[in-house]
């Protein structure tokens, strides 16, 4: 809607979600030939832990080459791959040589790899943080690594501690397969901060529907709905509500998000950089108790959600 307002004469090409989803499934099938430990990051991105696969398929670099080759043969698409000791370094490496690159960060060479890169390459260092760091004389990741972590924490708060660890190549997060995840979430980061409450609400509703659709696909209804808000100054808050029963109904998730939005952001004047919606507390959707009216409503939700899912996959 915003793009149309800014560029009323632009030609907009409708997305083909069903095609994207099918190609994503093909690529995911290639990943799972080499490891069951696959954590989707987006339709076209994922983290793979191939630690236990080396005896069968060779070292990580060889597995990466094979995956690139098989994706090209089966989908006619190129892929950029980063091979590294942890998730942060692997993601950074994969971004350095798009669209058809292969970057290997050897164990023990993290410092040499990171040293010359601009500090903006670190997750969470946006324009404002980069400006603060630049005023401190910090231009590269190497510059950042040489700054005392305590001083960074004074300047940037807990965010400073986090980026200090990343600057030293430290990232302890495990690769979490989708089926083992304790929550389902979607979030979006805006190129420009969003200030209008109605625009924030529209984004949260869209994210809630994405989460509900994914939960239905995974057959993982949940009781706890959460919103995540990152403001322009990188302060991040989360707010959650626990429902009476587990659900993956789009209507119920939208209602929960509306409630959380009204409580925290309905009158917000602060610009927002990121919004997210999550679902957790997985249980049995059939555990819902209620009268005939609630069961009729549940049946209607199921029908509507089926229509929504088919429409989402089609368009």
For the regions a language model picked out, list residue spans one by one:
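Gly/Gly-Pro- and Ser/Thr-rich, intrinsically disordered tail segments characteristic of DNA damage-repair
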Residues: 1-162, 175, 213, 296-315
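Short Gly/Ser/Thr- and Asp/Glu-enriched loop/turn motifs at secondary-structure junctions
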Residues: 41-45, 84-87, 220-224, 270-274
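Short, hydrophobic beta-strand segments
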Residues: 46-52, 238-241, 288-294
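Short loop/turn motifs enriched for small/polar and acidic residues
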Residues: 51, 84-86, 230, 278-282
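Surface-exposed, charge/polar-rich loops and edge strands
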Residues: 112, 186, 283
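DNA-contacting surface of Y-family translesion DNA polymerases
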Residues: 121, 129-272
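Acidic, metal-coordinating catalytic segment for phosphate/diphosphate chemistry
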Residues: 245-315
């Amino acid at each position: 809607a915003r793009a149309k307002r800014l560029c009323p004469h632009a030609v907009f090409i409708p997305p083909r979600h069903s095609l994207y989803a099918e190609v994503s499934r093909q690529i995911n099938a290639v990943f799972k030939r080499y490891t069951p430990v696959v954590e989707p990051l987006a339709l076209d991105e994922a983290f793979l832990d191939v630690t236990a696969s080396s005896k069968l398929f060779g070292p990580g670099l060889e597995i990466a080459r094979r995956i690139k080759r098989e994706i090209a043969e089966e989908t006619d698409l190129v892929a950029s791959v980063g091979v590294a000791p942890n998730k942060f370094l692997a993601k950074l490496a994969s971004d350095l040589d798009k669209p058809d690159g292969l970057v290997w960060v050897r164990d023990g060479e993290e410092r040499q790899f990171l040293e010359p890169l601009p500090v903006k390459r670190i997750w969470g260092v946006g324009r404002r943080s980069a400006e603060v760091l630049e005023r401190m004389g910090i231009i590269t990741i190497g510059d950042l690594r040489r700054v005392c972590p305590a001083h960074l924490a004074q300047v940037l708060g807990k965010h400073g501690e986090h980026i200090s660890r990343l600057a030293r190549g430290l990232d302890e997060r495990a690769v979490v397969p989708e089926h083992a995840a304790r929550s389902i979430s979607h979030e979006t980061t805006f190129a420009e901060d969003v200030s209008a409450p109605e625009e924030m609400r529209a984004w949260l509703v869209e994210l809630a529907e994405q989460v509900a659709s994914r939960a239905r696909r995974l057959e993982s209804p949940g009781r706890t709905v959460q919103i995540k808000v990152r403001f322009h100054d990188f302060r991040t808050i989360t707010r959650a509500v626990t429902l009476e029963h587990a659900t993956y109904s789009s209507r119920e998730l939208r209602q929960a998000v509306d409630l959380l939005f009204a409580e925290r952001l309905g009158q917000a004047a602060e610009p927002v950089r990121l919004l997210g919606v999550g679902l957790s507390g997985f249980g049995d959707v059939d555990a819902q108790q209620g009268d005939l009216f609630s069961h009729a409503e549940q049946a209607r939700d199921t029908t509507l959600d089926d229509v929504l899912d088919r429409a989402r996959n089609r368009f």
